[in-house]
C-alpha cells in the first residue's frame, strides 16, 4: 500500500495542491493535483470559506497520510503577510480536523530537494517537477502553485527517508 503525501501552496487567489503516492522503494508517482482558484472579486472571508471547503473535499476524497507546507515567511507588505497567514491557518485547520500529520519546510529546502539549489527560480522548480514525476502540465505558467506543492511533497519524501532525520 502506498503512502499519500499532499503538498499545499496556500494563497488567497490561487492555492495549489499536489498529492504524490510513495510506492515501494520510494518510487514517486503523481496521484492527484490541482489549483483552487479564488476570485479577487470575492470578499476575503468568502475566499477563506471556499478554500476551506474545496481543500476539505480534496482531503476527504484522497485521505492523505501527511500534509506539507512551506514555513511562514514575512514579506515587505504586512497586509499580504497577514492574508497569507490566514490562508495557511485555513489549510492547517482542514488537515488538523482530519488528524493528518503536518510537516513544514523552508522554501529554499524544498527547492534544494527538487532542483539541487535553494535559490532556484519558479521555472526551474516547474521543469524539475515535470521531469521527476512526468507531469508536463506543471510547466504552464498558471500552474506554478501546483509545481510548488509537488516540490514540497517531494522534499518531504527525501527528508522522511533520511536516516539522519527523526521524521519517520
From Swiss-Prot:
The molecular function GO annotations come to: crossover junction DNA endonuclease activity; DNA binding; magnesium ion binding
Quote the NCBIfam families the UniProt record gives.
ruvC (TIGR00228)
Write one Pfam family the protein is assigned to. Answer: RuvC
Q: Which domain of life is it from?
A: Bacteria
How would you summarize the oligomeric state and partners of this protein? Answer: Homodimer which binds Holliday junction (HJ) DNA. The HJ becomes 2-fold symmetrical on binding to RuvC with unstacked arms; it has a different conformation from HJ DNA in complex with RuvA. In the full resolvosome a probable DNA-RuvA(4)-RuvB(12)-RuvC(2) complex forms which resolves the HJ.
* Cross-referenced SUPFAM superfamilies: Ribonuclease H-like
Role, per record: The RuvA-RuvB-RuvC complex processes Holliday junction (HJ) DNA during genetic recombination and DNA repair. Endonuclease that resolves HJ intermediates. Cleaves cruciform DNA by making single-stranded nicks across the HJ at symmetrical positions within the homologous arms, yielding a 5'-phosphate and a 3'-hydroxyl group; requires a central core of homology in the junction. The consensus cleavage sequence is 5'-(A/T)TT(C/G)-3'. Cleavage occurs on the 3'-side of the TT dinucleotide at the point of strand exchange.
- HAMAP family to which the protein is assigned, alphabetical: RuvC (MF_00034)
**Could you tell me what reaction this enzyme catalyses?**
Endonucleolytic cleavage at a junction such as a reciprocal single-stranded crossover between two homologous DNA duplexes (Holliday junction)
E.C. code = 3.1.21.10
Q: What gene makes this protein?
A: ruvC
Q: Is Magnesium among this UniProt entry's keywords?
A: yes
What GO biological process terms does the UniProt entry carry, in alphabetical order? DNA recombination; DNA repair
Q: Give the organism the record lists.
A: Chlamydia pneumoniae
Query: What stretch or stretches form a coiled coil here?
Result: none
Among the entry's GO cellular component annotations, what is one?
cytoplasm
**Would I find Ribosomal protein among this entry's keywords?**
no
Query: What's the chief localization of this chain?
Result: cytoplasm
Residues given in the record as Mg(2+) 1 binding sites: 9, 145
- What's the protein called, per UniProt? Crossover junction endodeoxyribonuclease RuvC
Q: How is the cofactor bound?
A: Binds 2 Mg(2+) ion per subunit.
Q: What is its subcellular localisation?
A: Cytoplasm
What are its cofactors?
Mg(2+)
Amino acid at each position: 500500500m502506498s503512502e499519500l503525501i499532499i503538498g499545499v501552496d496556500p494563497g488567497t487567489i490561487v492555492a495549489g495542491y499536489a498529492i504524490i503516492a510513495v510506492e515501494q522503494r520510494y518510487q514517486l508517482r503523481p496521484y492527484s493535483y490541482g489549483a483552487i482558484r479564488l476570485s479577487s472579486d470575492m470578499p476575503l472571508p468568502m475566499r477563506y470559506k471556499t478554500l476551506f471547503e474545496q481543500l476539505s473535499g480534496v482531503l476527504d476524497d484522497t485521505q492523505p497520510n501527511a500534509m506539507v507546507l512551506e514555513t511562514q515567511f514575512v514579506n515587505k507588505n504586512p497586509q499580504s503577510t497577514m492574508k497569507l497567514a490566514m490562508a495557511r491557518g485555513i489549510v492547517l485547520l482542514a488537515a488538523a480536523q482530519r488528524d493528518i500529520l503536518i510537516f513544514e519546510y523552508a522554501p529554499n529546502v524544498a527547492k534544494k530537494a527538487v532542483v539541487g539549489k535553494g535559490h532556484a527560480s519558479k521555472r526551474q522548480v516547474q521543469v524539475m517537477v515535470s521531469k521527476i514525476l512526468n507531469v508536463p502540465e506543471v510547466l504552464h505558467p498558471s500552474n506554478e502553485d501546483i509545481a510548488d506543492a509537488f516540490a514540497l511533497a517531494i522534499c518531504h519524501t527525501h527528508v522522511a527517508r533520511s536516516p539522519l532525520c527523526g521524521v519517520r
